Amino acid sequence: MKKQILLGALAFVLFASVSAQSVDTPVYLDDTKPVELRVEDALSRMTLEEKIAMIHAQSKFCSPGVSRLGIPEIWCTDGPHGIRPEVLWDEWDQAGWTNDSCVAFPALTCLAATWNPDMALLYGKSIGEEARYRNKTILLGPGVNIYRTPLNGRNFEYMGEDPYLSSKMVVPYVQG
């Protein structure tokens, strides 16, 4: 009988502690809640200074997080055809890390010329893996529009002038 009472009490304490933990989880950390609700909850917990800091870069390609709320830094990178090697915070020179290297993929016009969506998927997966390895949160590319003018200095980041071809090649790239 004592054993049953002890097991019952233990089960009650365990259930109560699990229930209390789930109630204490902030809405912004609850993956089951809608994104809009999570964003509103996170914003309501942030100070004005923290909000301003998040929309103002702390260096090239980086915005600070809010460590007290568990919100990580945001790291961006150029790279619709390869992840940029690390650069110095105060100038555009390469950081010169001896353990730093990157894969330079062919420009997206070359990828589009293959007319191969499976290749675009593999290309996107490869870039995504390198971005994750380098702890990059946002990839600045690819350009998903079509060429509008030959004078656009970023045309190499697009997949050409043909909207049909672009749509067939960009989607698997992004999914990758």
Regions found by a protein language model. Give the residues of each.
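Bacterial Sec-dependent N-terminal signal peptides
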Residues: 1-24
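N-terminal beta-rich core of secreted/periplasmic extracellular enzymes
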Residues: 21-176
